[in-house]
Every structure is written in C-alpha cells, then in structure tokens.
C-alpha cells in the first residue's frame, strides 16, 4: 500500500526534474496556484463524498495525488513531513 504513495512521490520528483510536455502532473508542478486550487477543490469534494457516502475512495485518492504534487511544487520534502509525523507518535 505505502509503495503506491512512495511511487507517487518518486513520480513527482522525477517529473519536476524531467518534465513531459502535456503532462497534467507537470502542469501541477509548474503552476503553484493551480496546484493549491486543486488541493482545496479535491478536499472539498472528499468532504462532500463522505457526507453523501458516495465516491469516497475516488475522492480520497484525488486528495492524495494533488497534495503530493502541491508539496513537491512547493519544495516540501516528504521525508521532513514523515519525520514530523514520527515525532508526534506517543
């Protein structure tokens, strides 16, 4: 399961270094404003899906994908996020 998330982080880093023309991923990585808008949009869609008990998995996946791209676009390193989460374990 976590391998899928790790693959997305690797994809984001790779595409940031080696862009592919026409790639949606690259569009998100190069346009911080769009990336931010998409994270907000997808979170709202997830909340709605949970409230309606419909399409929750699809919307949750969208949130993960767009959040990963947003973090990478803004040079937030996942390793640092993971370190912070580890500090919070009790």
Where are these regions (language model features)?
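Flexible "arm" and connector segments at domain edges
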Residues: 1-60, 64-90
